[in-house]
């Protein structure tokens, strides 16, 4: 079994969190995102105050209001959720390019080869949580484990706003006490069949030989045998369609002022243009952007639709970005958003566990 470092990030009640962030009046009271009851609406997600009344995702809005008469239901704002998701993925890409999005609010990261924090996946997860809270003003839960199956379980272990780590030496004991219903791919039908066979935990499942499980469950029996032992060889499937291309550099000595930053632009743009030239023809460069990280680790990104990709356009963007902080700079980045000419579109998982 290969040893990898996998992080599963799951935003806490994502749609609701964005609404409460943008409208503080909603915070601290039961609220949900979804359709109105008079229109046969359905709850997309709700905050934890509403969950205390039994309100859940995919519940009819009318039923939710019966459970919680004071529930405030707001219309979804999908573009706001997409924008927040893009910002979160920008943070992810600082640590690894191996990112598998599951929905707007959930993703796997493979940080096995990351050099951040001397390769500590736990510290990377902590830093991601800190940066999301600081920059987006919402919380995420994180799970760290040697594989995807365990990382996803771990992220749910201390929700909301939690971090749980399963180290390789803890896998066998941790998995043994797991209910079989928590296993990846085990739905109600399979869970009921396992219960009829007297199998309620992974410890009990381990008593069954591999061939016996295959006889009972077909090819999924092989999967059950492995999961009961904490084995999951699925790789993080990187998102093959890029949203941007960029280059950045962290300087040994902080750049003290705007002019010293502007002097670095030609070299950065030369590297960026080399990367763009290597891309296939299914992408078209779109909006240019610059990224500035100041000496105190605060950062800002400036982009402009319709601007050119020439040196003067980037000089203007950098000048505007620098003005937001006006402090010595430790990192500069330049890039361009990409338009996917294949027409790929992002799917919203409205009724997922969000």
UniProtKB/Swiss-Prot annotation:
Example of a GO biological process term: SOS response
Compartments in which it is found: Cytoplasm
Active site positions: 106
A Pfam family the protein falls into: IMS_HHH_1
Catalytically driven reaction(s): DNA(n) + a 2'-deoxyribonucleoside 5'-triphosphate = DNA(n+1) + diphosphate
PROSITE patterns, A to Z: UMUC
Keyword Nucleus tagged: no
Cofactor(s) needed by this chain: Mg(2+)
Stored CDD domains: PolY_Pol_IV_kappa
Keyword terms: Cytoplasm, DNA damage, DNA repair, DNA replication, DNA-binding, DNA-directed DNA polymerase, Magnesium, Metal-binding, Mutator protein, Nucleotidyltransferase, Transferase
UmuC domain residues: 6-187
Site, as annotated: Substrate discrimination: 15
Chief location bin: cytoplasm
Function, as annotated: Poorly processive, error-prone DNA polymerase involved in untargeted mutagenesis. Copies undamaged DNA at stalled replication forks, which arise in vivo from mismatched or misaligned primer ends. These misaligned primers can be extended by PolIV. Exhibits no 3'-5' exonuclease (proofreading) activity. May be involved in translesional synthesis, in conjunction with the beta clamp from PolIII.
Entry-linked PANTHER family: DNA POLYMERASE KAPPA, DNA REPAIR POLYMERASE UMUC / TRANSFERASE FAMILY MEMBER
Family: Belongs to the DNA polymerase type-Y family.
Protein name listed in UniProt: DNA polymerase IV
Organism, scientific name: Pseudomonas entomophila (strain L48)
């Amino acid at each position: 079994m290969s040893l990898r470092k996998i992080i599963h990030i799951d935003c806490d009640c994502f749609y609701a969190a964005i609404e409460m962030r943008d409208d503080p009046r909603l915070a601290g009271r039961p609220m949900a995102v979804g359709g109105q009851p008079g229109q046969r609406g359905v709850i997309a997600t709700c905050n934890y105050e509403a969950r205390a009344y039994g309100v859940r995702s995919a519940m009819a809005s009318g039923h939710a209001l019966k459970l919680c008469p004071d529930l405030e239901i707001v219309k979804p704002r999908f573009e706001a959720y997409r924008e927040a998701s893009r910002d979160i993925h920008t943070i992810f890409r600082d640590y690894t390019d191996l990112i598998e999005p599951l929905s707007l609010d959930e993703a796997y990261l493979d940080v096995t080869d990351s050099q951040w924090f001397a390769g500590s996946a736990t510290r990377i997860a902590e830093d991601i949580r800190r940066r999301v809270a600081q920059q987006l003003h919402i919380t995420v839960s994180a799970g760290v484990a040697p594989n995807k199956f365990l990382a996803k379980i771990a992220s749910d272990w201390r929700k909301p706003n939690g971090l749980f780590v399963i180290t390789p030496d803890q896998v066998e004991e941790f998995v043994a006490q797991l209910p079989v219903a928590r296993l990846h791919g085990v739905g109600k039908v399979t869970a009921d069949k396992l219960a009829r066979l007297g199998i309620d935990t992974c410890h009990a499942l381990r008593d069954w030989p591999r061939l016996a499980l295959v006889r009972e469950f077909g090819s999924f029996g092989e999967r059950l045998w492995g999961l009961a032992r904490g084995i999951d060889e699925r790789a993080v499937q990187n998102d093959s369609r890029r949203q941007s291309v960029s280059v950045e550099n962290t300087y040994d000595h902080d750049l003290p002022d705007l002019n010293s930053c502007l002097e670095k632009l030609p070299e950065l743009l030369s590297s960026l243009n080399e990367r763009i030239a290597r891309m296939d023809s299914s992408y078209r460069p779109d909006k240019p952007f610059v990224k500035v990280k100041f000496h105190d680790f605060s950062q800002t990104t400036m982009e402009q639709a319709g601007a050119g990709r020439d040196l003067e356009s980037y000089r203007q963007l950098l000048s505007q970005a620098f003005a937001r902080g006006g402090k010595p700079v430790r990192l500069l980045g330049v890039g361009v958003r990409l338009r996917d000419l294949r027409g790929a579109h992002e799917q919203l998982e409205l009724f997922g566990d969000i």
